[in-house]
Amino acid sequence: MHGDRGPYNIPALDDRDWGGGYLHTGQPNELWSYGEENYRIMKKYYDIRISMHDYIRDLYKEASENGSPLIRTMFYEFPDDKKCWELQEQYMFGSEYLVAPIFHLNEFEREVYLPEGRWEDTRDGKVYEGGQTIRAAAPIDSIPVFKKMA
């Protein structure tokens, strides 16, 4: 885990500091410091990230060669699909994975637009035909992710 985990209230060190102190990183941010239930969820996604090492490496290589972002708007990958130009709450991770996270509190399912083609739900292997909007379950421990099939 990266970043800053408060709360804390540290007075400014001098007039160049707006509070928080220099080099302060907040509270512990290791996976296990968030409690057992959260650890289980974060560990699952950490393991998925490790298993995608080669894919992620290739995305970084592509980015260094032609500037393609790792995280892409839907219209970046599907410029001819007018619906993809309207989507704000789902994205592509590289050219293969469509990610549809939850953005709203107490929401446990969501609509996901699948562009043309065939898409596999990475959680259960179910295959969907693209060109449609589906309803995807999204319990607290499961982010809807769909892999574009060749």
What are these regions (language model features)?
Residues 1-150:
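Catalytic-domain carbohydrate-binding cleft regions of carbohydrate-active enzymes
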